[in-house]
From Swiss-Prot:
Keywords: ATP synthesis, Cell inner membrane, Cell membrane, CF(1), Hydrogen ion transport, Ion transport, Membrane, Transport
Membrane topology: Peripheral membrane protein
Function comment: Produces ATP from ADP in the presence of a proton gradient across the membrane. The gamma chain is believed to be important in regulating ATPase activity and the flow of protons through the CF(0) complex.
Signal sequence annotation: none
Entries under CDD domains matching the protein: F1-ATPase_gamma
UniProt keyword annotation of Cell wall biogenesis/degradation present: no
A cellular-component GO term for this protein: proton-transporting ATP synthase complex
PROSITE patterns named among the record's database cross-references: ATPASE_GAMMA (PS00153)
Localization: Cell inner membrane
NCBIfam families, A to Z: ATPsyn_F1gamma (TIGR01146), PRK05621.1-4 (NF004146)
Keyword Membrane: yes
Species this protein is from: Mesorhizobium japonicum (strain LMG 29417 / CECT 9101 / MAFF 303099) (Mesorhizobium loti (strain MAFF 303099))
GO terms of biological process kind: proton motive force-driven plasma membrane ATP synthesis
Name listed for the protein in its UniProt record: ATP synthase gamma chain
Length: 294
């Protein structure tokens, strides 16, 4: 049984931890608001970009004018996975859920005899995936020093992916991230970004219905410029969704930790008071017994 001094030290230690988790919860709440606004602002642009690409693709009928980034290599032997996670932990199962989705995808591909290559964006995903797939990891993108995510960060990742595609390093690229739904709900998502895949979009989903468009310059030339830009936009959206999801998960995790610390403090305080009461009672009995002996 721990002594009263040990219990006092444990209560003080848990109280100090509770102050830290409470402060981290408040910081995450402040950052969440900004991250959520950024993620929600990026969604309409990203969706509109997909709509424009679908319209142009219909205009050329998916013919020979379509760039390779849209049509693909015609093979699916080599898959590149861009796995986006957080740089830091203390956010519950946020990182492990994304990594689990990626690992399941890797296992399916390997079972089908495919070759897999990985780019890790974020330290936590890298730490998880390198345990079993270190030889498949081509690169790790470090964003720890980035205070505010910008389009330039996503563009650098997209250009790296496009460069690898142009060199024939892979056939299909899939982006893994967590889509932000709410503070308590982040959905791990896998999105194919190469080939772009908008050529297969249903006609009903394309804005404009039966409208006729005229393009200048030629649709193929427009696509050659828009598709790399669209890949950058999709990566940027994934990073913003991840940032909002991370802050939501961290806020929730720190709230749970703060409440658990409070419960632990209550239990330790009850134990401390009972032991102190028992000790006082024992001392009183000894004093009374001594007085009676006299």
């Amino acid at each position: 049984m721990p002594s009263l001094k040990d219990l006092r030290n444990r209560i003080a230690s848990v109280k100090a931890t509770q102050k830290i988790t409470k402060a981290m919860q408040m910081v995450a709440a402040a950052k969440l608001r900004r991250a959520q606004e950024a993620a929600e602002a990026a969604r309409p642009y990203s969706e509109r970009m997909g709509s424009v690409l679908a319209n142009i693709t219909q205009a050329i009928g998916g013919g020979g004018d379509a760039p390779a980034l849209m049509t693909g290599t015609g093979k699916d032997n080599v898959h590149l996975l861009v796995v986006c996670t957080a740089e830091r932990g203390l956010c519950g199962g946020f990182n492990s859920q994304i990594a689990r989705l990626a690992r399941d995808h890797i296992r399916r591909l390997l079972a089908d005899g495919k070759q897999v290559k990985i780019i890790c964006v974020g330290k936590k995903g890298f730490d998880i995936l390198r345990r079993d797939y270190a030889s498949m990891i081509l690169d790790r993108v470090d964003l720890r020093e980035v205070k505010t995510l910008g389009f330039v960060n996503a563009d650098a990742i997209a250009k790296k992916v496009i460069h690898l595609f142009n060199e024939g390093a892979f056939d299909i690229c899939t982006l893994f991230y967590s889509q932000f739904k709410s503070v308590i709900s982040q959905v791990p998502t896998a999105q194919q970004i190469i080939p772009a895949g908008v050529a297969s979009a249903p006609a009903a989903a394309v804005d404009g219905g039966n409208a006729v468009y005229e393009y200048e310059p030629e649709p193929g030339e427009i696509l050659s410029d828009l598709i790399p830009r669209n890949i950058s936009v999709q990566v940027f959206r994934a990073l913003l969704e991840n940032a909002a999801g991370e802050m939501g998960a961290k806020m929730s995790a720190m709230d749970n930790a703060t409440r658990n610390a409070g419960e632990m403090i209550n239990k330790l305080s009850i134990t401390y008071n009972r032991q102190r009461q028992a000790q006082i009672t024992k001392e009183l009995i000894e004093i009374i017994s001594g007085a009676e002996a006299l």
